[in-house]
A protein has these predicted regions:
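Helix-loop-helix junctions that connect adjacent transmembrane segments
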Residues: 18-23, 63, 137-143, 171-298
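Juxtamembrane helix-boundary/capping and inter-helix hinge elements in multi-pass membrane proteins
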Residues: 57-59, 86-90, 99-105, 233-241, ...
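TM-loop-TM module centered on a large, flexible mid-protein loop between adjacent transmembrane helices
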Residues: 95-96, 102, 134-139, 245-312, ...
Length: 375
């Protein structure tokens, strides 16, 4: 009997518990919103408004497109809220596909996420960060790549500390990013009196094909809210909390995008907006001079940082889910309970990202190569 009890106690002490080695509810609702908003609001909002304005050719339809983008995203978010509350899992889309179509199909999706989609997105955003930081501090002929490598390593190290550190950094970066967009909106309303002319609303109607093209740009800018599924098992409050988190994120995104576009119309006019290649920079420069343009560069760099960190958080969880289900990738299926993070998933992700950045060094345009790689 003594031998049996000793063996049982030894087995208990040496076998990791399910709590220690699986995701637990450590994320606050605010942190979860910061992750979702941080993924969605990237550099796109600084570029796509001019493209949408040029395609629609009307201020009214421009705003309709952005509002409709919010409604479509909301509809999708409601579907994901149902999935995330019914099947909360670190695998997110991978887990949903596995339940619907089997693990073979879901493996292809998760493998693409792990090796191309997430890692390629991180690499291209790292080059965006590097390009903007090089304007402030040039580190030589490979400055952009050096900055890109540095940011991948730095954010990976922060995430290795644990979910508390990474979520705190994510919240801070998202606040700075949103503040920057609010500053852009203020600049637009500040110079609205100097705008060429008040844009006419619904004076012309774009063709169905052109409006559809505008919606492509809009939905591209809204893209990423579905990543909420990857953190659904880690939000405090469980199933009751994830629905408000997703809905609040979409509401915040829609309000910010509408506010920014209204401000751009007020400050630049429809024609100025449609012809601008850097709408936010032009607006900030017009409102505050060279100082405004330099400040915007900092906010764009922060936007890239925000998206990189958020993508790292959800991407590592894809690696973890793969490791849990596939014996050949078992080394990635370890969850560090004390840190609340898939440490090995982060390390694999970082290695692939760094390899992509280093590959980009030897290309004419590292950013362009990463765009083609992820397309």
């Amino acid at each position: 009997v003594i031998h049996h009890e000793t063996f049982s106690f030894y087995a208990f002490m040496t076998q990791p518990t399910s709590i220690a080695n699986e995701p637990t509810q450590r994320l606050t609702a605010f942190s979860a919103i910061a992750i979702i908003v941080g993924i969605v609001i990237g550099a796109g909002i600084f570029k796509t408004p001019s493209m949408v304005a040029g395609v629609t050719g009307d201020a009214g339809w421009l705003l309709v497109a952005w509002f409709l983008g919010g409604l479509i995203s909301l509809a999708g978010a409601l579907c994901y809220a149902e999935l995330a509350t019914t099947y909360p899992h670190a695998g997110g889309d991978y887990h949903f596909l596995a339940r619907a179509f089997g693990k073979d199909i879901s493996f292809l999706y998760a493998w693409a996420k792990a090796t191309v989609i997430n890692t390629g997105s991180i690499a291209l955003l790292a080059f965006v960060f590097g390009d903007y930081m090089t304007k402030a501090i040039n580190l030589g002929p490979y400055s952009s790549a050096i900055w890109a490598i540095g940011v991948v390593v730095a954010l990976t190290l922060i995430n290795l500390i644990g979910i508390s550190a990474s979520s705190w950094v994510q919240t801070l970066l998202t606040i700075i990013e949103v503040t920057g967009l609010i500053l852009v909106a203020i600049a637009g309303f500040y110079i609205s009196g100097d705008a060429p002319a008040s844009p006419a609303f619904f004076s012309s109607t774009p063709s169905l094909g052109m409006f559809g093209l505008a919606m492509v740009f809009v939905l591209l800018t809204y893209g990423g809210w579905n990543e909420a599924a990857y953190i659904s098992a880690e939000v405090r409050g469980g199933r009751r909390a994830i629905v408000p988190v997703i809905l609040m994120s979409i509401l915040i995104l829609t309000l910010i995008y509408l506010l920014v576009n209204i401000a751009l119309l007020a400050g630049l006019g429809l024609e100025g907006l449609s012809k601008s290649s850097a709408v936010a920079a032009d607006l900030m420069g017009k409102a505050f001079g060279p100082w405004g343009e330099r400040t915007l560069g900092i906010f764009v760099a922060v936007a890239a940082l925000t998206s990189i960190n958020a993508t790292m958080i959800v991407g590592a969880r894809t690696n973890y889910a793969l490791g849990k289900d596939w014996p050949a990738l078992r080394f990635m299926g370890h969850w560090e309970g004390g840190r609340g993070s898939p440490i090995r998933g982060y390390l694999v992700q970082s290695a692939i990202c760094l390899a992509l950045v280093i590959f980009g060094i030897f290309q004419t345009d590292g950013f362009g190569v990463m765009v083609e790689f992820t397309a």
